[in-house]
Amino acid sequence: NMFLHACLRVVQLWRMGCLVLCGFFLCFGGGAAAFAAPSVEEMAGQMLLVGFKGQEPEECGAILGDIQTRHLGGVILFKRDARNAKLPRNIRDAAQVKRLTAALRGASAGHPLFVAVDQEGGKVARFQPGDGFPAYPSAAELGRGTPDATRRTALGMGRMLRELGVNLNFAPVLDVNVYPASPAIGRLGRSFSADPQAVAAHGAAFADGLNDAGIVAVFKHFPGHGSARADSHKGVTDISATWSERELSPYRSALGRPGQRMVMTGHLFHAGLDPAFPATLSPSVINGLLRGRLGYDGVVVTDDLQMDAIAAEYTL
């Protein structure tokens, strides 16, 4: 059937090492017994991290059921609906979020579950001051200070996330601010600096702060979104003429440090890296560049597959 076909495809990806959520938990918090002999369905489910609608547990029967029966690897919380920003999604206030995340974890039935969020600081913050949460500076603001100050800021953020029941933060951004007017990065203050070494230092410090609070960090958007003239939320983003090897420098540096980190691929097309597919769908970029040349052997996670750079161009 369709689900089994999807499971078999995921097993192939599992063996390729593109996204090993179970392996991550085995290394950092699961224990060998929990993953002694996962079924095909369990492996498939653990490869998926999904969004859902609802704020209170009683509104979330569908996702709670999928966590139980499909063994989902994770969920992600949003403030607003991605397709209609006027509609609320998962976050109202701290007490409500704690009830929701407790129910999500309770449904995992012994399987590890990531509860994720995008909390970079600045304009990219799902937990916002208007809902009673602390305000945090953007990467651009942090980049004007010291890496130690960045680590302390991320530690405070991580402690807040942990208290809310979140254990995975899709931050920090390792994109170099090559093009300050880049609509998805530079214009929003999401890059630490135009200097790759400064990006590496602040990115590593941010990840250290999150890790010290018990939060897994995610470096993004590989291989580099900072030179892009377009926004991958809205369509194909071709960096063939603007990207350079210097944008890999933060990854080379930050990935060499110990810690609980993942790498997120961007929906970025570069004809010289892969003439057919964007990074998210590219064995050449993931297995060849990231795992081969850079030697990364950890978890790789995609950017949102509902973004138009993927959803408008590819079918399942």
Predicted regions and their residues:
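N-terminal secretory signal peptides that target proteins for export/translocation
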Residues: 1-13
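Bacterial N-terminal signal peptides
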Residues: 16-29
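N-terminal hydrophobic targeting/anchoring segments and the immediately downstream early-domain regions
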Residues: 34-131
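Hydrophobic faces of well-ordered beta-strands that scaffold small-molecule active sites
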Residues: 46-52, 73-77, 115-117, 169-171, ...
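Second-shell residues forming the walls of enzyme active-site clefts
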Residues: 58-62, 87-109, 198-316
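Glycine-rich anion/phosphate-binding loops
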Residues: 93-97, 144-156, 200
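Glycine-rich, aromatic-flanked loop segments that form ligand/cofactor-binding clefts
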Residues: 105-134, 154-177, 199-223
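A charged helix-plus-loop insertion that forms the helical arch/lid used to bind
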Residues: 132-145, 189-193
